[in-house]
């Protein structure tokens, strides 16, 4: 039997603390070489603004096997009343290959993306960080706020986006209530950056939206949005001045304009990347080494994140009797 799990089921079963813990283990396993994760297969349809990806992974130690199909269609909300990001995840039995669960992957994508930033923040941000800033207030920003609050002892979170002030205020009010942390609107991206100890960028920008002169010493940056070649959120000088940690170096070189563009400009080399988050977790390389350096976690999103979280959701669903059983063989 296959367990069918909808968005509400996933939301009830996958908390941010659990997601961060399972992702820490997944990144460590990838670094240790006990996970298989082929390059994602991507299809782009510019005629409809569509980005389609198929992302398989097998974490041998964790026993998680599966694949995610995810799409990003920018016109969905306005034209069809659908989310921009739509995903579905298959979880398979590692011994038989049988699909044991099919679940909504849209919400899970937001949670796991935030959780990765949370794990990176745990390892790379200054321990005395008290103010975080999030640039972007779309659906994917929700998980980022939750993860930052979980990862650091924050007194305040600043938010800024190009959306209207009422939408930003609604976002701030909602998450102030959920987290118990003061969430306020910044007047500009620059004012947010200058005040924050931790900054997460989660936008669909095509050109840099921050300037290297804005960062104060010791800032930790999570560069999460604009994860495609040729587009970026960060200017070249920011990448040059930061200690760069990737979710996976080769994936960032292949897909992240934030890294790819400086390399193509001839002012940054792949060897300048400090390493992968899993290597920091496993103690193979140093993370933050002093309170003055600027650290940058660049993430394009990996299948190990989806499949490890989905496997956890499936196990918890079985324990709690959540979901609908369905027999595909009838």
Positions of the model-derived regions?
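N-terminal ligand-binding/catalytic initiation module
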Residues: 1-110, 118, 128, 275, ...
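Adenosine-phosphate binding glycine-rich loop
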Residues: 7-9, 231-330
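Glycine/charged-rich beta-loop-alpha catalytic/anionic-binding loops adjacent to active sites
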Residues: 95-105, 158, 183, 289-294
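Active-site glycine-rich loop that binds ribose-phosphate moieties when present
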Residues: 116-117, 139-146, 174, 181-187, ...
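Glycine-rich adenosine-cofactor-binding loop
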Residues: 117, 125-151, 160-164
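Residues at the starts of beta-strands that form the adenosine-phosphate
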Residues: 131, 155-156, 182
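NAD(P)-binding Rossmann-fold cofactor-contacting core
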Residues: 150-178
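Rossmann-like adenosine-cofactor binding region
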Residues: 180-267
């Amino acid at each position: 039997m296959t367990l069918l799990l909808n968005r509400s089921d996933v939301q009830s079963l996958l908390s941010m603390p659990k997601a961060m813990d399972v992702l820490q283990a997944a990144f460590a396993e990838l670094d240790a070489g006990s996970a298989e994760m082929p390059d994602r297969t991507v299809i782009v349809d510019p005629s409809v603004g569509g980005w389609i990806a198929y992302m398989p992974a097998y974490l041998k130690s964790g026993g998680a096997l599966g694949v995610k199909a995810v799409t990003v269609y920018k016109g969905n909300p306005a034209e069809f009343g659908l989310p921009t990001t739509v995903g579905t995840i298959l979880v398979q039995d590692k011994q038989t290959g049988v699909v044991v669960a099919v679940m909504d992957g849209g919400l899970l994508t937001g949670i796991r993306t935030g959780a990765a930033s949370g794990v990176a923040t745990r390892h790379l941000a200054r321990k005395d960080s008290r103010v975080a800033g999030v640039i972007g207030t779309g659906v994917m920003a929700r998980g980022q706020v939750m993860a930052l609050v979980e990862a650091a002892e924050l007194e305040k979170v600043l938010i800024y986006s190009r959306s209207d002030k009422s939408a930003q205020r609604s976002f701030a009010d909602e998450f102030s209530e959920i987290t118990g942390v003061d969430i306020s609107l910044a007047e500009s991206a620059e004012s947010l950056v200058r005040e924050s100890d931790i900054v997460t960028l989660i936008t669909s920008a095509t050109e840099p939206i921050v300037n290297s002169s804005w960062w104060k010493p010791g800032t930790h940056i999570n560069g999460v949005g604009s994860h495609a070649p040729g587009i970026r959120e960060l200017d070249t000088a920011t990448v040059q001045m930061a200690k760069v940690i990737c979710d996976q170096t080769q994936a960032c070189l292949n897909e992240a304009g934030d890294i790819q563009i400086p390399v193509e400009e001839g002012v940054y080399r792949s060897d300048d990347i400090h390493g992968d988050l899993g290597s920091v977790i496993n103690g193979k390389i140093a993370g933050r080494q002093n309170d003055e350096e600027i650290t940058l976690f660049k993430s394009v999103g990996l299948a190990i994140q989806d499949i490890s979280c989905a496997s956890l959701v499936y196990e918890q669903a079985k324990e709690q009797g959540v979901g609908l059983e369905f027999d595909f063989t009838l």
